[in-house]
Amino acid sequence: GFCLVGSEMCIRDSNMSMEITRFSPAVGAEIRGVDLSRGLTGEEFKEVHKAFLDHQVLFFREQKEIPPEVHVEIGKRFGNLHFHPAAPQMEGHPEIFVIHTHRDSKIANGEFWHSDVSCDEEPPLGTMLQLHLLPPVGGDTLFSNMYQAYEELSETFQKFCDGLSALHESEHVYRGRYSDRGVDDAGKVYPSSVHPVVRTHPETGRKALYVNRAFTTRIQELSEDESRAVLDLLLDHCEQLSFQTRFRWQKNDVVLWDNRCVQHHALWDYWPEERKGRRVTIAGDRPY
């Protein structure tokens, strides 16, 4: 059932003490009292799924390491799994993307604001990441609420953006990106797609801005100069501090985020230290 603790909302299950607490005014909730390494019961999944739609990003604290097959199984509760167009897969578990940054890395995953693989025709709906190895300090992940970004535009500008579509490209992001992890991408064609600038969330019906600094390169209906000006304005707007929260990881924390209404940015401020974990990505549908 539900209970209120002060001004915070918690949800308690009769068989366990799952507790859901708002993480920041803009976005996110922290969840305690559920052991993801054992998977989710039907009742637990229902509570987690509701919280996912209500809060956009879920932070699961005090976790054990999730076995890869359980990680995959939890991801599949939300839908089919998405296969990354560029990154190396985990041996024996092709659905798992291993995140690993160390002293010799040329790049780090997600070190700019983005929504995961928005260049795909059907971009992923969500991502579930667990980190097992962390730097002593640094390596935080920031999240920004794209519902709020849309809602805080003037009504006139909302209407203008409602009629626009944008090109999302990935060649400049992925080409050669994973060469230090044994990926030879010679001859590979990386995806690009056109999506609405404002997308409607298929489960909540709410509108969210859907342009990001990593993948979005051009607004289709505008001239090049107009496109650059409008895109720069929107990207700066999306990155406002008041739409954001910042998560400091502890070992084995798990974060589940909704790519349809949230952008994120993984800070690479910990070189030469190491950061490592595993993620599954849940397939989504074509934005509208």
Region annotations inferred by a language model:
Residues 1-13:
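Single conserved hydrophobic/aromatic residue that forms the stacking wall/gate
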